[in-house]
Amino acid sequence: MDWQLDAAELRVLGALMEKEATTPDYYPMSLNALVNACNQKSNREPVVNFDEETVETALHELRAKGLSSRISGESRVPKHEQRFVEKFNLGRREAAVMCVLMLRGPQTVGELRGRTERIFTFDDLEGVESTLQRLAEIGFVKKLPRQTGYKEQRWAQLLAGDIEVAEEAAPAMMERGASDRDRIAALEEEVAELKRAFEQFRRNFE
């Protein structure tokens, strides 16, 4: 690749890919919706608090790299969509894995299988592994050395450059705590999405 993404560009691109798959009725996305998608608490590691300027700048850079486009249709509000999947001719499996790695950082094969389920359902771990191998062949991901405290090796995306692995221990208790936070954040996000859908429904009848 002759380009590299910064943290904001990576989050924006990942959010666009996720919402295209999970909420197609609200895609392409307005700037405001994209800010909310970047900042949501569920399915995000780390959780961020981007403002509109940060997301707008990231979108500009992504457009310059041919990874997103801006649509000005009948609506007065410009919408944004990702071009990453099309640009690199990725299948649904590859797109799902890349999306989750962009949004949640390095993960094990088992974590990826569970977390990609809303985007693409893998039949088994071998399917995830073979997808990762294909992505590794084109330089998009790599397998990290096993860390102290982890039973399995993790995989990382390389769109934002190579990743340095810290040697600190990662106790199992930390993993369990993260899992609990994931469940709570997911419930909070579901409630927030229901509220947004209701507001959209209400505005349609005003």
Swiss-Prot record:
PANTHER family per record: UPF0502 PROTEIN YCEH
Top-level taxon: Bacteria
Disulfide linkage: none
Family, similarity comment: Belongs to the UPF0502 family.
Protein name: UPF0502 protein Acid_1185
Origin organism lineage: Bacteria, Pseudomonadati, Acidobacteriota, Terriglobia, Bryobacterales
Family annotation (Gene3D superfamilies): Winged helix-like DNA-binding domain superfamily/Winged helix DNA-binding domain
UniProt cross-references to Pfam families, sorted A to Z: DUF480 (PF04337)
InterPro entries: DUF480, WH-like_DNA-bd_sf, WH_DNA-bd_sf
Organism: Solibacter usitatus (strain Ellin6076)
